Each structure stands twice: as C-alpha cells, then as structure tokens.
C-alpha cells in the first residue's frame, strides 16, 4: 500500500482532511458569500502545503480532488478546474524535492508564469475580451503571489499542532552551526566525518530507489551522536592514543559500544530532535551483534558459545521499520567495512557489500515492512 505510514495514522488523515475541507469552505465563502472572483480560491496553497508535509503524489492527488469538487460547486466551472490543476501542478513540481527555504519563494515566480499562460490560453480559446483576460490575470497573479507566503505560515502551524516533521525542518537540521552538530564536530571529529560520508552514501541510495533522500542524510548526521559520551572508546576518534579496549574485558567493551545508542537517544531528547530523526539512532544497528568483541570473548572461552551470554553483545534495537532506516543500517556497515579493506579494488568492494547486506538481512534487517 502506498505510504502506509501516512494512511494508517489517523492524525495524518485528519490533517489532510482539514486542509482539503478548509479549501472548500474558503471557496464557498469567496464565491457565494463575498462574490469575489473564483481565481482567488487558494487551491495552490493546499497543493504546496500537502506536498511539503507528505510528498508530490499526495499533493497532486488531493489537488485533483479539491479542484474538481470546487469546480462542481461552482456549477461545473471547467475553466477553474483547468487553471487550478495547471498552476498547482507547476507548484508541486517545483517543490517536490525541497532542499532550502528560499525554494518555496522562488516557486512564486513559477506560479505567476503558469497563471499568465493558463489565463491567456483560456481567454484566447473562449474569445474573451482583453479587459476580462487582464482582470482574471491580475486576480490569479495575486493568488499566486500570496500562495507561498500563506503556505510557509501553514507549515509552521501544522508542524506544531500535528507534530509533523517537514523537509523544511530537516533542512534546518543539516546546518553545521546547530549546537548538537557543532558539539559533534568538536568532541567526536572522526565520528562526525564518518557520519558525513555515510550521509552522502545513504542519500544516493535513497534517491536511486525513490526513498526520502533528505531524511536519510539527516538521519546519518545524527545517528552516532551518542559516541560523544566516551568518544575515545570508538576507533575513528582514536588518533595517537592507545586503544582503551586493550585494557578491559570484551564484555565491558561491548557494553561501552552498545551504550552509544541509549546515550544518543538521551542527547536527541535533550536537544529536541524530531522522532523521525531520533529513530535512526537505535535502528541503524537494530538487534545486531557487536561482532568484534563477541569473537574476542568466544576465543577467551575456547570457542564454547554456551559460556557466553550473547545478549551482552547485542544492540537493544528495534530493527529498522522504514526504507530510510534500513538504508542507513546497510550504508553505515558498508562504509566501515569497505574502509578496512587492504588494497581495495572493485571486486573486493562488491564482495564486501554483498557480504554485509546478507549479514544484515540475517541478523537484524527484516525486509517485510521495507
């Protein structure tokens, strides 16, 4: 089922319903009560808002439904339906992959250009007077100018009321000047660089399969923030110093390594990370095993698995439950494994990737819901 995460959540269905019904109510007030031009009905506002909140498909399909319903309400006004669908489609296309806030306002010019095209086309086709065409053009241009501004305000309101995390918020979380990322750069520079590389890899993978690439990048930036606690116990942060794990037992080493998950969740809560981002912290390991220290412990008891409590070496989970968290789990493991290959070549890298994916599927990554 398409976007089961959205359509199985009553709050998201309520949000979509509220936006669509509000548009129809406004249309009724503008046309029947105030008797203004139908071109003041803010159909494109709903299209932009739903596209940013969810995705382009939901934004487009809801616009089709609302445009047709409002057109019928106006007495089968086909001109309104055509103009609304054309302009809203242009708007949806322009912000389908939002990467910066200014993109929302540059969409304003695309909407205005679309307004000019559709009004002149309809006017010429119906042989309307130029006075009528110019009047409709002025009205629709005003609508197109205000649409992104109103959308920007609505996004902030819906994020607060319905606890939705939009791409606009995710973009803000990528800012290196955010307190948590600045702290990560300062205290765990090795881990931070690793996270940037994993973010690039995860974003590319997500783009290739049609997943949420921006969310993958943001999740990668924050997935290892728990390593700021006891940073020097993680190999990427060990520069000239000795490996502290050499002086402690494998069970203690595994405990310290596993603790970065809970520490990360605590930091995420402290710094107010959205749940959709903090979910990457426990899910990027799922319930996999801290293999290196498990093997050390196994060697210490002569290979007798019955003498080892395996739960001491497993991450608490949960397993990834979205495409994005699944992608990060695989990319994070691949980045670390490929970096360890001596004299790497294409064949060695491909073999390692196949091995990692197979291991993750067998030990933590369920593809049933992904």
Residue positions per predicted region:
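Divalent metal-dependent catalytic cores for phosphoryl transfer on phosphate-bearing substrates
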Residues: 181-343, 359
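Conserved small/polar residues in nucleotide/adenosyl-binding loops
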Residues: 368-370
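A glycine-rich phosphate-binding loop feature that marks nucleotide/adenosyl-phosphate handling sites
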Residues: 107-113, 135-140, 175, 215-225, ...
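C-terminal structured "cap/appendage" subdomains that terminate the fold
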Residues: 337-366
